[in-house]
UniProtKB/Swiss-Prot annotation:
Listed name of the protein: MFS-type transporter traF
GO molecular function, one term: transmembrane transporter activity
InterPro entries the UniProt entry points to: MFS, MFS_dom, MFS_trans_sf
Annotated source species: Penicillium crustosum
The entry's keywords: Glycoprotein, Membrane, Transmembrane, Transmembrane helix, Transport
Gene3D superfamilies, A to Z: MFS general substrate transporter like domains
The keyword Membrane is assigned to this record: yes
This protein's GO CC annotations: plasma membrane
Length: 482
């Protein structure tokens, strides 16, 4: 069975890269295979309810890790009052966590290739919970900032690993639907964080309970995942089965030097040499940074300018949530109709992934400009809140389909492409909130958001460019499977 062998053999060489040792996967596992196409041990052959359950568990852990990134954003005022720090310094509680998202994939990506999905993911979530405890009882801001960075680093484990877990379980067409639902959790987490954090911070519980809630949620869902979900990474599953049966052939060996080269060097080479990866990483990084900037911009617009309290002021984030869910529906409909027909007739159609992304590239700046020019306090609040639906839908469509396109284009090289993409996103996600207050204070909400809208408009051509010329560009690359 060819597909089983391809999944189990991680030292595959890519087309056009024979002379490039960095194109080889770093783990020389023995060539093992399943006992036929219906082998029940193959994660692809799990029952649909079992696949859905595992997917839901992975989505829950991703949601919790991203929820933790923004849940403290409404606590800036209390941090300023309690520790006597500036507003700009208080934003580091969010920025350092997101910076950890840039570092974590460099650790957990290689770990998932050597140890499988389950144990690195579980260790990461557990350590995230452990390092949240010092924040909840912190007596100084240094403890908060250091531990927030560590929390973000370990919380990156689900972000770095869960996508691979979905690829283990689902065939390409079904995976498109599973990933769409999964992606909603990725974005619902950071959007719901300020909503929950706002009401918790405002209540008698105070800001420290934002951390206790994160700890409780993460440990409960981690326990469910660890107890009920099996390992899904085929090479590891096959190796364990062979060892159990006494059939493990010699040659299973990890080359840690090559592992370091592949994960530390190849992603940067790809970013420089691959126009598809470079432009999509720039676009997705901007979108990610803008999302985290919203956690500072929305309170300025609704709490400072319209005079809403911290709890009510977090409710407009629900409009982004609605937009995210609409985006999920759009992707599912596209996958089951146009994408399905394309796969049936052509067999491989990466550029078809860009159709929803093109829609999102129009919706996103439209929502930003709408938000900007309905922010005047003399206007009703409702139109400004509704703009969040277009922003949320645009964010989801651009980000998710950009990620799907990268995976389809680079295939087994996708881990390297995604790791550099995640690192760049994390840097922008951490950086954007830091200049938000300066920009909005100096330019005002209308022009600050309009500036971001113009930058977003400048990136609109990206999906259209690759939809038209993507196939031709892929033929130039030594990292893609043409």
């Amino acid at each position: 069975m060819t597909s089983g062998t391809e999944q189990a053999t991680l030292n595959t060489e890519e087309n056009g890269s024979d002379s490039d040792h960095l194109s080889k996967e770093p783990i020389a596992m023995p060539a093992l295979d399943w006992d036929g196409p219906t082998d029940s041990n193959n994660p692809r052959n799990f029952s649909t309810p079992k696949k859905v359950f595992i997917t839901a568990c992975l989505a829950s852990l991703v949601c919790i890790s991203t929820f933790g990134s923004s849940v403290m954003s409404p606590a800036s005022g209390q941090l300023i009052h309690e520790f006597g720090i500036s507003k700009e310094l208080s934003i580091l509680a969010t920025a350092l966590y997101v910076l950890g998202f840039a570092v974590g994939p460099l650790l957990f990506g290689p770990a998932s290739e050597v140890l499988g999905r389950k144990y690195p993911l579980s260790v990461g979530v557990f350590l995230f919970a452990i390092f949240s405890i010092p924040i909840a009882v912190a007596k100084n801001v240094a403890t908060i900032f250091v531990c927030r960075f560590l929390c973000g680093t370990f919380a990156a484990a689900p972000l770095a690993i869960a996508g691979g877990g979905l690829a283990d379980l689902w065939e390409p067409l079904s995976r498109g639907i599973a990933v769409a639902g999964f992606a909603s959790a990725t974005f619902l987490g950071p959007v719901l964080g300020p909503l929950v954090g706002g009401f918790v911070t405002k209540s008698h519980l105070g800001w420290r309970w934002t951390q206790w809630l994160s700890i409780i949620f993460s440990l409960v869902f981690l326990a469910i995942y660890f107890v009920f979900c099996p390992e899904t990474y085929s090479p590891i599953v096959l190796a364990r089965l062979a060892k159990k049966r006494g059939q493990m052939p010699p040659g299973g060996k990890v080359d840690f030097k090559q592992l370091a080269k592949v994960y530390m060097l190849r992603p940067f080479i790809m970013l420089v040499q691959e126009p598809i990866l470079a432009l999509l990483t720039l676009y997705m990084g901007f979108i990610y940074g803008f999302l985290y900037l919203c956690f500072e911009a929305f309170p300025i617009a609704f709490e400072e300018h319209r005079g809403w309290d911290i709890g009510i002021g977090s409710l407009p984030f629900l409009s982004i949530t609605v937009g995210v869910l609409i985006g999920v529906v759009i992707i599912i409909v596209h996958t089951m109709t146009r994408m399905r027909r394309k796969l049936e007739t052509v067999g491989d159609a990466p550029e078809e992934r860009l159709v929803p992304m093109m829609i999102g590239s129009i919706l996103m700046p439209a929502g930003i400009f709408w938000f900007a020019w309905t922010s005047n306090t003399s206007l009703p609040w409702a139109p400004q809140v509704v703009s969040g639906v277009f922003i949320g839908c645009g964010i989801l469509l651009i980000f998710l389909q950009g990620m799907n396109y990268i995976i389809d284009v680079y295939k087994v090289m996708a881990n390297s492409a995604i790791s550099i993409n995640a690192m760049f996103r994390g840097l922008l996600g951490a950086g954007f909130p830091l200049f938000a207050s300066y920009m909005f204070d100096n330019l005002g909400v209308p022009w600050a958001m309009s500036l971001l809208g113009f930058l977003c408009v400048a990136l609109v051509p990206v999906p259209f460019l690759f939809f038209i010329y993507g196939e031709r560009i892929r033929k130039w690359s030594k990292f893609t499977a043409h």
